[in-house]
């Protein structure tokens, strides 16, 4: 099994998978009589159909045992999905490019610094949320509407990957 190298999360490195949601280096302007700095349009919510709605949820995630064997990835073909850490803790992101199925050799791993969120573009393969802390909370922006919006792909044993945040 191949061990994934964990890369720092940057806008450039993550661009083919979605948006990095962060204030560092982002455009902003003042509002509310100059008392508030607005970092505008950090990501775009994607939905497949006009009747789909963007919704906001909170996911409370428990840490998984590490090192982790990456056995599966999922994708959301009908909408984007954003994860914004609420407690400021670093977390891990495992992704693969859009396609009929994820290619094990193209899977990449990233580490958020805890002040960065991610917005997965429609159809991007990704692992379910991976917190490093025992328990963590994430603001999630995704799509509500008709139709199945979650496909799962399970790797064969030869395709499985190892994720070790302590490497």
UniProtKB/Swiss-Prot annotation:
Its cofactor is Ni(2+). Disulfide bonds: none annotated. CDD domains: cupin_UAH. Pathway: Nitrogen metabolism; (S)-allantoin degradation. One of its GO terms (molecular function) is ureidoglycolate lyase activity. Pfam families: Ureidogly_lyase (PF04115). Keywords: Lyase, Purine metabolism. SUPFAM superfamilies: RmlC-like cupins. It catalyses: (S)-ureidoglycolate = urea + glyoxylate. GO terms for biological process: allantoin catabolic process; purine nucleobase catabolic process. Its EC number is 4.3.2.3. HAMAP family: Ureidogly_lyase. Belongs to the ureidoglycolate lyase family. Catalyzes the catabolism of the allantoin degradation intermediate (S)-ureidoglycolate, generating urea and glyoxylate. Involved in the utilization of allantoin as nitrogen source. PANTHER family: UREIDOGLYCOLATE HYDROLASE (PTHR21221), UREIDOGLYCOLATE LYASE (PTHR21221:SF1). Homodimer. This is Ureidoglycolate lyase. It comes from Pseudomonas putida (strain ATCC 47054 / DSM 6125 / CFBP 8728 / NCIMB 11950 / KT2440). The lineage of its organism: Bacteria, Pseudomonadati, Pseudomonadota, Gammaproteobacteria, Pseudomonadales. The gene is allA.
